[in-house]
Amino acid sequence: MRPPGRRDVPSARPALPLLLLLLSPLLLGAPHGVGASSGAPAELRVRVRLPDGQVTEESLQADSDADSISLDLRKPDGTLISFIADFKKDVKIFRALILGELEKGQSQFQALCFVTRLYHNEIIPSEAMAKLRQKNPRAVRQAEEVRGLEQLHMDIAVNFSQGGLLSPHLRNVCAEATDAIYTRQEDAQFWTERGVDSSVFEPLLKELEQVELPRCGQVGDRGKPCICHYSLSLAWYPCMLKYCHSRDRPAPYKCGIRSCRKSYRFDFYVPQRQLCLWDEDP
């Protein structure tokens, strides 16, 4: 397996209330398929406000049959961020398609994939997501809860040719990042203990070698190896179900969602500084 690298291919407090999303089929006990056809992913488009104040559109899709959720958003600089939650495999996948700067010798765009363990309390179930509706699609949404920054040290490469063993979504989502798919040792260990073949994973470097490498922002020679940092944010996603009480019902019932924003910072090895030109020293 080649070292991961680039594959060339052509805050203020959030306002309340947030999104009045009708969970109509879910709340009213409608049969499966009412509001979203069985077997076809249900899509929700939401206008969201980014941390810098700019507005973009998110597309959220849920496939209750595959038990997965996907989110796509385009940043103002043109970067496309995609997120997949695969509940069946306990896997979440982040992909960034970063537009290149031709004047710096970069290709049209660069793709990165980060794969980590999914905890089921991070996001609402796919069946609930598939039944979300919104009353005012033109409204600009802002997350009710800002969750803390998560910093992740990605020290394992994922073998793209074997990636389907980890998640069936990986080979499609990370097709442009075949040599730049990263995960963590602790997550790889969790998946191998659950039966994923160890051939899916390969250490990037020995721990001592990574400690000795400088941050890419401190390296002037674009041909030198270094530790790259990449940050991304999920600006708005349904992280929890809300429950309401009623005199007419003996038990609490689902009546909406709570939305969250969460940021991630990944650090990982690159064989050349040229593959991490966005990472500049402050």
Curated annotation (Swiss-Prot):
Range of residues in the leader sequence: 1-29
UniProt keyword annotation of Signal present: yes
Keywords for this protein: Signal
Family: Belongs to the OAF family.
Protein's recorded name: Out at first protein homolog
